[in-house]
A protein has these predicted regions:
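CN hydrolase (nitrilase-like) catalytic-core segments centered on the catalytic cysteine
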Residues: 62-80, 146, 150-242
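Active-site catalytic loop in hydrolytic enzyme cores
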Residues: 62-65, 87-192, 257-261
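Short beta-strand scaffold segments in enzyme catalytic cores
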Residues: 81-83, 94-98, 132, 222-224, ...
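Short amphipathic alpha-helices and their capping/turn segments at secondary-structure boundaries
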Residues: 22-36, 153-162
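Cys-nucleophile CN-hydrolase/nitrilase-fold catalytic domain and related Cys-dependent amidase chemistry
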Residues: 17, 26-110, 172-195, 199-202
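A short C-terminal boundary segment appended to hydrolase-like catalytic domains
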Residues: 253-286
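N-terminal phosphate-binding loop and adjacent alpha-helix
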Residues: 9-26
Length: 286
C-alpha cells in the first residue's frame, strides 16, 4: 500500500514566527485536503533563514507554547518543520521537528553549519552531534538539514540504521549557471538526491523554500525521488507549491533485493578505518 506525502514549498517571513505559524496552518490544511499522511516544511520554516542577531529572539524550547499549534495540527497527519531551538544549556540550534498524533516524536539538530560565502550558520548556532532514525508515516526516517546532506556520511549513517525515507528540509539559495543553462544549485541538488535515493535504495523528500531574504532568492525545486532513482514529483522553481506524491514501501523492498548494496556494505571496514584515523582501538568480535 502506498503512502501519500506532501512537501510545503513555502516562503516564510523573516523573524515573523506568529505569521509563519498561521501560514503553516494553511499549508497543513491543504496537505490534509490532498489526502497526505505527512507534510514536510523547509529548513527554519517557522522563522526564516537569514536571522543573524534575530536568532535569539525567535528561539524556543521544545516545550514552548508557540509549538503547540504544530503539535495539535499533527493529530491526523504527521508534520515536520524547522525552527530555532534554545536547548536547556541555552545553546541555539537549527532544528527540524517531527510531530505525530499530537506529540513531538523527534528533533534533529543541524550538524554541519556552513560558514563560508553567503552562509553564516556557524556564527549564530551550535552544531548538533548525532544522526538518529525514527518511525514516520512513510517508514523509518532520518533528517538531513540542507548542508547535512552535502556530507555523504549523513545519508549513509541513516541508511545503515535502517532508514527508508530521507527528509531533506532546505533553505537553498539559487546560485550559478550549469552547462546547458540550468540553475547550478538545482543541478547539484538533483544529482545528489538521485544518487542517495538510488544507491542507498530509499526515498528522498527534498523540501526547499522559496522567497527572498537580504537580496537572496531561494529557488524551490522541491522533489520526491524513489529508491530506483526515478522522479516521483517535482515542484516548480521560485514559486510556492504544495508537492504531493506517493511513497511505496514495497518498492524499497524490491529495490533492496534487486540492488543489495546495503546488504553487502562492510560497516566494520568503515569503522576500522575511521577508528585508525582517530587513533582509537577497534576490535570486532563476532
Amino acid at each position: 500500500m502506498t503512502i501519500r506525502v506532501a512537501i510545503a514549498q513555502c516562503a516564510p517571513a523573516l523573524g515573523a514566527v506568529k505569521r509563519n505559524l498561521d501560514m503553516h496552518q494553511t499549508w497543513i490544511a491543504r496537505a490534509r485536503d490532498a489526502g497526505a499522511r505527512l507534510v514536510v516544511f523547509p529548513e527554519l520554516a517557522l522563522t526564516g533563514y537569514y536571522l543573524k542577531d534575530l536568532a535569539a529572539d525567535v528561539a524556543v524550547g521544545l516545550d514552548h507554547p508557540l509549538l503547540a499549534p504544530i503539535a495539535e495540527a499533527s493529530r491526523d497527519l504527521d508534520v515536520s518543520t524547522g525552527f530555532v531551538e534554545r536547548s536547556r544549556d541555552a545553546k541555539l540550534h537549527i532544528a527540524q521537528g517531527y510531530w505525530s498524533r499530537g506529540t513531538l516524536v523527534h528533533v534533529h539538530r543541524k550538524v554541519y553549519l556552513p560558514t563560508y560565502g553567503i552562509f553564516d550558520d556557524g556564527r549564530y548556532f551550535g552544531p548538533g552531534d548525532r544522526f538518529e532514525t525514527f518511525p514516520s508515516a512513510g517508514g523509518t526516517a532520518g533528517i538531513a538539514i540542507c548542508e547535512d546532506a552535502w556530507h555523504v556520511s549523513t545519508p549513509y549513517l541513516y541508511a545503515a540504521a535502517g532508514a527508508t525515507l530521507l527528509l531533506g528540509p532546505s533553505a537553498s539559495p539559487g546560485r550559478g549557471v550549469a552547462e546547458g543553462g540550468d540553475l547550478g544549485t538545482a543541478e547539484s541538488c538533483r544529482l545528489m538526491d538521485r544518487f542517495y535515493a538510488q544507491y542507498l535504495t530509499l526515498y528522498v523528500l527534498y523540501a526547499n523554500r522559496v522567497g527572498h531574504e537580504d537580496g537572496i532568492a531561494f529557488w524551490g525545486g522541491s522533489e520526491i525521488v524513489a529508491p530506483d532513482g526515478t522522479l516521483v514529483a517535482r515542484a516548480p522553481e521560485f514559486d510556492e507549491h504544495l508537492l504531493v506524491g506517493e511513497v511505496d514501501p514495497d518498492l524499497v523492498a524490491r529495490e533492496r533485493a534487486r540492488n543489495p548494496l546495503l546488504r553487502d556494505e562492510r560497516d566494520d571496514i568503515v569503522l576500522r578505518n575511521i577508528a585508525s584515523r582517530l587513533g582509537l582501538a577497534f576490535d570486532r568480535r563476532d
